[in-house]
Design a protein with these regions (language model features):
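Solvent-exposed loop and edge beta-strand segments that line ligand/cofactor-binding
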Residues: 138-147, 195-201, 264, 270
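Short, charged, amphipathic alpha-helices and their helix-cap/turn boundaries
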Residues: 19-22, 65, 99-140, 165-184
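Active-site Gly/Thr loop motif
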Residues: 181-185, 232-284, 289
Length: 313
């Protein structure tokens, strides 16, 4: 009641299997209204890369440069696995309290923000990311993950290079695998390349259906695999520590996990959790209205609530 009564609240939904357990909406938001899920979009990269890995088309230990010869020094020697785990140190930063953060330049390149000069493509921007100042490599020596939305776009280019088809076709199949009631909307850059780093928009119910694909360990509603069961099991077991206030979680293969559930947050107040053991998935959508649109202390109560609901009982 407290969290769904906040002035920033948009929608919340919970499903168990094919049953809608709970839903709640703000007075100015409808059940059939799509909402940006921001970085919860990144979980789609887990499903796509996991499928390609299981099919033997991607080696998690190979370098990004081996897959994408055009990539710059910021990713050339990083492995696919390190990019999946946000375990790469380079010249890209994502500090929303800094008006000059690289992430805002990335948004301009991908069409999410007006550019101040020319209109570079997302690929050109990603290719130009270099090493961190003074660094000789991309090794992460911080002891915790280094969150970079550019990592997901790198993985998207990897998926397109090794998948043999356009990324949009993967997203069409994802919509079918989730069994969306409405539509899976996704933003693209100026060249039509889908933005897996944060471009997907779904209703609250359909966000739960999307998360349930991971909760079923990669199976679509028709029982056919879209992601990868062994890859998702490895996701639950692996990962890099996250700093406080999420120190009890790990960042693993484009998800957050505590070894029991899989989830992800989104800029502005979104969070999704799916629990493979109980078959429950819960989504919370909101629009946090402060100076930066982000507050790390806002998320822990939401995460705790969704995790407790998805634990069942």
């Amino acid at each position: 009641r407290r969290l769904t009564g906040l002035p920033w609240f948009s929608a919340m939904a919970v499903i168990e299997g094919n049953r809608l357990v709970y839903e709640s909406y703000a007075a100015d938001f409808r059940a059939d209204q799509p909402h940006s899920i921001m970085s919860i979009s990144k979980m789609s990269a887990n499903l796509i890369i996991g499928r390609l890995w299981e099919e033997g088309r991607i080696d998690l230990g190979e370098t990004i440069g081996a897959v994408l010869p055009w990539i710059g020094a910021g990713y050339r020697e990083a492995t696919v696995q390190d990019v999946l785990n946000m375990n790469v140190k380079n010249g890209y930063d994502e500090d929303y309290s800094n008006p000059d953060t690289t992430a805002f330049l990335h948004e301009a390149a991908s069409g999410m923000r007006l550019p101040t000069g020319g209109e570079p493509s997302n690929r050109d921007f990603i290719a130009a990311i270099g090493l961190a100042p003074g660094a000789k490599d991309t090794v992460n020596d911080t002891g915790t993950y280094l969150y970079k939305s550019a990592n997901t776009d790198v993985l998207a280019f990897v998926a397109e290079a090794r998948g043999g088809r356009a990324l949009g076709q993967w997203l069409a199949d994802l919509a079918d695998a989730a069994g969306v009631e409405g539509a899976l909307h996704v933003a693209t850059d100026r060249q039509g390349f889908p933005l897996l780093n944060g471009g997907i928009c779904l209703t609250a119910r359909d966000l739960c259906r999307y998360g349930a694909v991971l909760g079923r360990l990669g199976l679509g509603v028709d029982g056919r695999p879209f992601g990868s069961d062994p890859f998702l099991r490895a996701t639950l077991a692996g990962g890099i520590s996250m700093p406080p206030p999420r120190g009890h979680l790990r960042y693993s293969n484009q998800t957050n996990t505590n070894g029991v559930w899989l989830g992800h947050g989104g800029y502005g107040g979104q969070y999704l959790i799916t629990n493979p053991k109980t078959g429950r998935t819960a989504a919370f959508l909101s629009v946090l209205q402060d100076t930066s649109g982000y507050d790390p202390s806002y998320y822990p109560p939401i995460i705790a609530m969704l995790a407790e609901i998805c634990a069942g009982g």
